[in-house]
């Protein structure tokens, strides 16, 4: 039986880079749980429930489950019987931070391993922060996010 992975993030919003990481990781795992985390920003662009629902609507593979992340990531992983944490790396600059997180998670729960997948070249510059900035300034985000997410962001902007 293939293992279960947790793919954590704020996904505010879900980008094509996130989707690419999940699609490339699916052959490695029996199941991937996308753990949508609350954001530390006082005013998230999308509410947690909105993000969870959008992600679930975009990622329709039965091996993908989308849940709100509660508590410590390693505790969440144990609760859902996951033995891997999946992380995407866009650039070398991501590695230092992710490496520290991986070691901290290992200290908290050595039975849970962190797996890194590098972003494909076409996605290495895409970030939720940049997408939010483009939305705020009235730009077109359709090259960077799934069509469903682009439509949702456009509707929110028109309100």
From Swiss-Prot:
The keyword Hydrolase does not apply. It comes from Coxiella burnetii (strain RSA 493 / Nine Mile phase I). Pathway: Cofactor biosynthesis; coenzyme A biosynthesis; CoA from (R)-pantothenate: step 4/5. This is Phosphopantetheine adenylyltransferase. Homohexamer. Signal peptide: none annotated. NCBIfam families: coaD_prev_kdtB, cyt_tran_rel. Reversibly transfers an adenylyl group from ATP to 4'-phosphopantetheine, yielding dephospho-CoA (dPCoA) and pyrophosphate. It catalyses: (R)-4'-phosphopantetheine + ATP + H(+) = 3'-dephospho-CoA + diphosphate. GO terms for molecular function: ATP binding; pantetheine-phosphate adenylyltransferase activity. Its cofactor is Mg(2+). It is found in: Cytoplasm.
